[in-house]
Amino acid sequence: MVKFCPKCNNLMLPKDGKLKCAVCGYEEETTAEGSKEYEYKEHLENKKEKITVIESEGLETLPTTRIECPKCGHNEAYWWLQQTRCADEPETRFYKCKKCGHTWREYD
């Protein structure tokens, strides 16, 4: 069951046998039976991020750009974009040095 604060209309959460508004601090008593109706359980999933690194096969089809490799100093690398975070965040730009093959990423 969900209960909203009568003062500010925000969600009230159970705390120490009472319902409490986290925004304005309004508290409301609950009965012993009622407290079971308002149990709060948080479920978080551990999502592991998989990142695909492009191997040397097929690199020649990727676009290139002039950027300095942090490992060898060469000034040309392949690049590609990949969504590695939430959809509402920008893509991650990956680079792979044409000379030494070092791969690094850049965030916007």
UniProtKB/Swiss-Prot annotation:
Zn(2+) 1 binds at C5, C8, C21, C24. GO terms for cellular component: DNA-directed RNA polymerase complex. Zn(2+) 2 binds at C69, C72, C97, C100. A zinc finger (TFIIS-type) spans 65-105. One of its GO terms (molecular function) is zinc ion binding. Keywords: DNA-binding, DNA-directed RNA polymerase, Metal-binding, Transcription, Transcription regulation, Zinc, Zinc-finger. Induces RNA cleavage activity in the RNA polymerase. In its presence, the cleavage activity of the RNA polymerase truncates the RNA back to position +15 in a stepwise manner by releasing mainly dinucleotides from the 3'-end of the nascent RNA. The truncated RNAs are able to continue elongation. Involved in transcriptional proofreading and fidelity. Misincorporation of nucleotides during elongation of transcription leads to arrested elongation complexes which are rescued by TFS-promoted removal of a dinucleotide from the 3'-end. Belongs to the archaeal RpoM/eukaryotic RPA12/RPB9/RPC11 RNA polymerase family. This is Transcription factor S.
